[in-house]
């Protein structure tokens, strides 16, 4: 946790920036919770239904990716940070799970280093 705190120091309390942080266990049941948290936080921006749906989809995909690929064998932590500055929403999803061995190769179409088989691949 000390590493995580160092990442946030100096960035958290900035004038004119509203922030939210949630720590989640890497459990698939938390994917929907993360979506709802972000959707609730962004209501202060008065988004359209389509904008809210787009953000919820992106959060769902990112959290699911952290759960499936970051922690395939064990539970771990996922940090969700949201910030609103002026009219911009920033969402950061971070895990400390298994990394990507070859980032360059991972950018290739249909590449997967999945331990669960070929049913999932990056597009």
Regions inferred by a protein language model and the residue ranges of each:
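Polybasic, low-complexity association/targeting segments
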Residues: 58-68
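STAS-typified acidic loop motif
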Residues: 21-32
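Conserved short strand/loop->alpha-helix "switch" segment adjacent to the catalytic nucleotide/phosphoryl-transfer site
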Residues: 32-60
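Conserved beta-strand-loop-beta-strand hairpin that lines the nucleotide-binding pocket
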Residues: 1-21, 66-123
